[in-house]
Structures are given as structure tokens and as C-alpha cells.
Curated annotation (Swiss-Prot):
GO MF annotations in UniProt: glycosaminoglycan binding
Alphabetical list of CDD domains matching this protein: MAM (cd06263)
Disulfide topology: none
PTM section of the record: O-glycosylated; contains chondroitin sulfate.
Lineage: Eukaryota, Metazoa, Chordata, Craniata, Vertebrata
Transmembrane feature ranges: none
Alphabetical keyword list: Extracellular matrix, Glycoprotein, Repeat, Secreted, Signal
UniProt-recorded name of the protein: MAM domain-containing protein 2
Domain MAM span(s) in chain numbering: 24-169, 168-329, 340-498, 507-666
Region (Disordered): 665-686
Chain positions carrying an annotated carbohydrate: 134, 329, 524
Cellular compartments per GO CC: extracellular matrix; extracellular region; interstitial matrix; membrane
Signal sequence bounds: 1-18
Subcellular location: Secreted, Extracellular space, Extracellular matrix
């Protein structure tokens, strides 16, 4: 049977009966298996003959929701959640189609995390495969249907199944084939082999799982090949959680010299990367292949066979598995993102400098009105080159990163700031060095940059040999030797530019795309504005955002307000939960007439808000980090209130808001604080 996408998932109708389904699963044969409709929304209706639940226009209007909530679940091991569903729309184009969303609700979080969302209509059942990371926390699965436009719109759920393991694993014994799909080609395609399937063109092997003619596997052969380089692709489900480890599978080749069997990854931007290729003709036995696999963001695994002609034989595939440890054939040290990151709050981490020469200097700056502090907190440590101790003409400062394994894609992110008014050519550059400190390549150098603004740089690279990332600062002469600062270095696997598949959780917002789930309360009040760069009024407000230096932040424009006027920015309603929560955000209060910035907790049905945190007056020219800890068992909202000060130099800004479960680390003791800057206005502590 041909595995073209839609035909494959139709076979999901033959999944195991409800009696065999594990916790968090349901086949909707007679009931909803512990999944309950949430009373605040429309109910999901169980079909009279069983088999599925649905919502449609017979009882719902456009925009109305139906929500299904599971009982408490636990997943101490990695799990795969598979959802068989169908969305129907009326014929023709629809501007507002129906939508199906799946959330995870952890017991200690006040918001739900979106795991998957689709508006894809179909005339048959489709299957979604979603990775659930192992956790010690209890959680619930929440499935939300939003009815779209059209008098025949509907959403139906046929089955939910949660099983231990990774979604990219498959032995091809179940009819849904783990969500793997064949990319249809008129001449060559992947087929299901074994069991009752027969093929008159090739003598195909027994499967690997059971070593039996009754077991199943996937295969592709060249019998219908008409042209050179006919290609067949078998595509895995998209990963939905970050993973790194060893991908293994079993394969057989016939006439291996006339075909090419390869494995690729493909991210959501469509970027392919080859991670494995067969290097021998093979034999009439199952061969084990192991390959290092890293998916720091959503991607697919593609098993591809290219035939050179009609005598290209066949390729068979079985028992795809994944382990979060490195392959047995892996040589050298494994990669660790923790070992390759540093905010310089406690020394240089795993970075080091040349032994000769003064090099980079680790410094900190107290909050003041003239010199920016570090990027991490505004008052912490960072590295500074070309200081009064190192600015001799011809000086070169090198900061070496830890060793990185070869043949892997890396993303380097760091923040830098330029100070002074001198020329900046080659003030900061990033090089790739081989293990023996031989220069490989310059991969980045600073261009013109705003002075005193922490800018984020991103660099993607891949080298076949082990390498080190080296940050180099050059002081050519007195007139070409500006101060350069470096902070918050991270090196991670993957491409920096891979697009995000899902929006950030409701508890996080950088304001770079929009205002997220925040809303304004404008009754008798002024407004928060979303802006970038400098604010319109001189000598107040930030020069750039905290996230990247060129992104967006929220601020009040004091020149549009009167003294004492307030602006409110409200979070979305948050669920009450036991335990503490930590609210982290960055604030900017610079200007001689700066007023107040306050954070309030607004409980549902309470007429008054509770003050959680406040700062009064001018604080610093830097973005400063705030940590706010609170508890609330009732439904509530967080309110950011900015109050205009005595003059137009009173712009106040916030950025990078994040809400997390648990207490804050390094919590400040004071709720309210007045002006917080240093009396030593321009002091650098070496």
C-alpha cells in the first residue's frame, strides 16, 4: 500500500482498542476516558456510534471554543502523544478557518503552554505526533477547538494516544506508522513490507523487529525507475521538544552501487543537512547505523534513496530508535551547552586568555547615569578590552572558548557594547581556531554600532575538525582603540536563524513581535507604547532594547502625559496555583524627572491591587533586572504601572518579561526603593 500522506493516516482507524490504551489516551469508543469538557466553554460531543468526539455548527457559532481536559498525568520518562483529528471547512477559500490547539498544563504554573496548533483542513483523518519531555511534575493535557467560518465547519478527534518513547522512533508494526509519511513520486515511493504485503519484483527480507515474514518494515525499490536520480523520501514527524543524542536504525541494501541511501534533517525554514550516508554496498542482512542527532528546534528526519537506474535494487528500513546519549562510535568529548556559556558573574567559566599580556579585564559598574553596566543584570560583571591597563598600540587581546567537537552545526550568541568616540575598525572580531591554536577563519567583526548599547550578535558555523571560538580585540593605535565590552556568551547546537514553530509561553515576552498577551487599561489613564531605538525626548529613556539592542520594548512617553498621570499594562488572566512564582523583567528609569514604576497583583473579584515591587526616581542609564516573588491561589493578573514624574525627562521602559514557577534565585530583600545609582557616578571596578 502506498504511503501517501492522507492514505497513511486513514489507517489510524485501526488503532488498538480503548482497553489497551495507556493513561492519557482515549479511542472515544464509549466515553471520553477521563477527558472532561471544561464547563466554561462548549462541550465536545461524543458521536452516537462512538469512535470520535466533535464540535460543529449544529450547536456552536464561529469563534466559540470547546475544551477537553485530561486527568492528572505523570511522565517520568519521555513520551510521545499522538492525536488523530480532522478539520473540515466549506468549499472555497475561508479567511477564518477552524483551529485545533493542544496545551500542557503543569500543576505549579499559572498558565498553559501551547505545544501544537493547526488550521489545516482535510477530507480525512490526519495524525499529529508531539514529544512530551520527561518531568517529575504532574500535568494535564488540554485540547482546544475553535470553530471557524462557514456553515459546515467542524472539528473532530478520533484518538489520543500517549506512549513511552520518542516520536521519531518506529518499528512500523502499527498501522499509523508512527506518523511517518512518504513524499509521493510518480515512479519511486516507500512502501510497507512484510506481513500480508507481497511483492513480485524483489525478494525482500524478513523484518528486523521479529525476524519474521509477518513483521513489518519500510522499503523502496527501483522497478519503476524511469530516469537517473529518481528520489524517494520517508519523512518523520516534526520534533516538538529539544533533543540530542544517538539516532539508530537498521537497513538492507541490494545493488548498493546503483543507489544512494542518505539521512537528512530539515528545519522549518526548509534547510537540509546531511547527517549520514551509506558508505558500503551492504549485504543481504540487517545492518545497524548510528548517527549523532541534534534537534535544538523543530525539525524532521528524512530517509532518502536516490536511484541511478532501473537496476538500482532496493533499500529496506526498520526499527528506528533514539537514545539521549552519544553513539558508541562517537569519538572525542561530547558537546555541553552549559560548559560553553558564560555571563562572567563568577570568573571566566571555561574561557581563558593568552598567558602573556594583560588581556581582557573582568569588571563591574555600579548603577549610574553615565556608564552602562553589564547586560546580565545591569550591575554585574562583564569583560572589557582596551582599558587603561591594556590600550597600548598594537595590543591584541584573545579570549578562547572551550573545545567544540567537529562536524556539528553551532550557534554562537553574545552581547557586546562599544564605548568612546574613537575609530572602531577591528575593535572586536570572532575567529575560529583549530585545537592547536592555528587560525582557521574570521567569522564576524564589529561594524558601526551605537555607543553604549548592548548589541546581540549571532553567528552560525560548522567545521569538520574540533575548534575553538576566539574573541579578539585589536588596539591599532591611540586613535583606533575604542573600549569594547563582552557579556552573556552562549554556544548551542543548531542554526541561529531557524524560525520558531510556536510562540513563546504566555509568561514570556520580549515585545519584539508584538505585545504578546499584555493589554492596556486606558480608563482615565495614559498608554504604554511599543518602541525601538531611542525615545523621542532627549536625556531620558533607553537607546535600545535589552534583548538585542535593536528590538522593541514598552515605554511611557512623558511628553504626552501630565505630572502624576499613570499608564497600566496588564498580563493575561493567570490561574491561581499553590507555591511561589518568580516574575523577572528589565526596567529602564533614566531622566532627571523620572517618576515611579510599580508592579501590582490584582486578584479576581478584589477591588484593590496589592503592591509587589516599586522603584522611585532616576535609577541608572542601564537596563536593570528586577526579581519579584509572589504567591496567589486565586485567578489574578500582574499590572505594570508607570507614573509620570515632574518633567518630560521621565520616560520609563520595561523589556524581557518572564514568569516562572518557583522562588526567585538571588532575591532582593526590598519591595520599595528610591533612587538606586552609585555616588561614584562613573566608577569601573576592576
Amino acid at each position: 500500500m502506498l504511503l501517501e500522506g492522507v492514505l497513511l493516516v486513514v489507517q489510524a482507524l485501526q488503532l488498538a482498542s480503548a482497553l489497551d490504551l495507556p493513561a492519557g489516551s482515549c479511542a472515544f469508543e464509549e466515553d471520553t476516558c477521563g477527558f472532561d469538557s471544561v464547563f466554561a466553554f462548549l462541550p465536545w460531543i461524543l458521536n452516537e456510534e462512538g469512535h470520535y468526539v466533535y464540535m460543529d455548527t449544529s450547536f456552536a457559532r464561529q469563534g466559540e471554543k470547546a475544551v477537553l481536559l485530561s486527568s492528572d498525568l505523570q511522565a517520568e520518562e519521555w513520551n510521545c502523544l499522538r492525536l488523530v483529528y480532522q478539520i473540515t471547512t466549506p468549499p472555497g477559500s475561508v479567511s477564518d478557518p477552524s483551529q485545533l490547539n493542544l496545551y500542557v498544563r503543569f500543576e505549579d504554573e499559572s498558565f498553559d503552554r501551547l505545544l501544537w496548533s493547526t488550521k489545516e483542513p482535510s477530507d480525512s483523518w490526519l495524525i499529529a505526533s508531539l514529544d512530551l519531555q520527561n518531568t517529575s511534575k504532574k500535568f494535564k493535557i488540554l485540547i482546544e477547538g475553535v470553530l471557524g467560518q462557514g456553515n459546515t465547519a467542524s472539528i473532530a478527534l478520533f484518538e489520543i494516544k500517549m506512549t513511552a518513547g520518542y516520536c521519531i522512533e518506529c518499528d512500523f508494526e502499527e498501522n499509523h506508522l508512527c506518523g511517518f509519511v512518504n513524499r509521493w513520486n510518480p515512479n519511486v515511493n516507500w512502501f510497507v513490507g512484510g506481513g500480508t504485503a507481497k511483492n513480485t519484483h524483489s525478494v525482500l527480507p524478513q523484518d528486523h523487529t521479529f525476524r519474521s515474514e509477518h513483521g513489518h518494515y519500510m522499503y523502496v525499490d527501483s522497478v519503476y525507475v524511469k530516469h537517473f536520480q529518481e528520489v524517494a523520501q520517508l519523512i518523520s514527524p516534526v520534533t516538538t521538544a529539544s533533543m540530542s543524542g544517538c539516532l539508530s536504525f537498521y537497513y538492507q541494501l541490494q545493488q548498493g552501487n546503483d543507489n544512494v541511501f542518505s539521512v537528512y534533517t530539515r528545519d522549518m525554514a526548509g534547510l537540509y543537512e546531511e547527517i549520514w550516508k551509506v558508505d558500503s554496498p551492504g549485504n543481504a542482512a540487517w545492518n545497524l547505523a548510528e548517527v549523532e542527532f541534534s534537534a535544538p528546534y523543530p525539525m524532521e528526519v528524512i530517509f532518502e534513496v536516490a536511484f541511478n537506474g532501473p537496476k538500482g535494487g532496493y533499500v529496506a528500513l526498520d526499527d528506528i530508535s533514539f537514545s539521549p546519549v552519544h553513539c558508541q562510535n562517537q569519538t572525542g568529548l561530547p558537546f555541553s551547552a552549559v560548559e560553553t556559556s558564560c555571563d562572567f558573574e563568577i570568573g571566566l567559566c571555561n574561557f581563558y586568555q593568552d598567558k602573556e599580556g594583560p588581556g581582557w579585564t573582568r569588571v563591574r559598574v555600579k548603577a549610574n547615569m553615565y556608564r552602562a553596566g553589564d547586560h546580565t543584570t545591569g550591575t554585574g560583571h562583564y569583560l572589557l578590552a582596551n582599558t587603561k591597563f591594556t590600550s597600548q598600540p598594537g595590543y591584541i587581546g584573545r579570549l578562547y572558548g572551550p573545545s567544540l567537537p567537529g562536524n556539528m552545526q553551532y550557534c554562537v550568541r553574545f552581547h557586546y557594547a562599544i564605548f568612546g568616540f574613537l575609530k572602531m575598525s577591528d575593535t572586536l572580531a570572532v575567529y575560529i581556531f583549530e585545537e592547536n591554536h592555528v587560525v582557521q577563519e574570521k567569522i564576524w567583526s564589529v561594524l558601526e554600532s551605537p555607543r553604549g548599547v548592548w548589541m546581540q550578535a549571532e553567528i552560525s558555523f560548522k567545521k569538520p575538525m574540533p575548534t575553538k571560538v576566539v574573541f579578539m580585540s585589536l588596539c591599532k593605535s591611540f586613535w583606533d582603540c575604542g573600549l569594547v565590552a563582552l557579556d552573556d556568551i552562549t554556544i548551542q547546537l543548531g542554526n541561529c536563524r531557524s524560525p520558531a514553530r510556536l510562540p513563546p509561553p504566555p509568561g514570556e515576552c520580549t515585545f519584539d513581535q508584538d505585545e504578546c498577551a499584555f493589554t492596556q487599561e486606558k480608563r482615565n489613564r495614559s498608554s504604554w507604547h511599543r518602541g525601538r531605538g531611542e525615545t523621542p525626548t532627549s536625556y531620558t529613556g533607553p537607546k535600545g532594547d535589552h534583548t538585542t539592542g535593536v528590538g522593541y520594548y514598552m515605554y511611557i512617553e512623558a511628553s504626552h502625559m501630565v505630572y502624576g498621570q499613570k499608564a497600566h499594562l496588564l498580563s493575561q488572566p493567570l490561574r491561581g496555583v499553590p507555591g511561589k512564582h518568580c516574575l523577572t523583567f528589565f526596567y529602564h528609569m533614566y531622566g532627571a524627572g523620572t517618576g515611579l514604576l510599580s508592579v501590582y497583583l490584582k486578584r479576581e473579584e478584589d477591588s484593590e491591587e496589592s503592591l509587589l515591587w516599586r522603584r522611585r526616581g532616576e535609577q541608572s542609564i542601564s537596563w536593570l533586572r528586577a526579581l519579584v516573588e509572589y504567591s496567589c491561589r486565586r485567578r489574578h493578573q500582574i499590572i505594570f504601572e508607570a507614573t509620570r514624574g515632574v518633567s518630560i525627562r521621565s520616560d520609563i521602559a520595561i523589556d524581557d518579561v518572564k514568569l516562572q514557577a518557583g522562588p526567585c534565585a538571588g532575591m532582593e530583600d526590598t519591595t520599595e526603593q528610591s533612587s538606586g545609582y552609585s555616588e561614584d557616578l562613573n566608577e569601573i571596578e576592576y
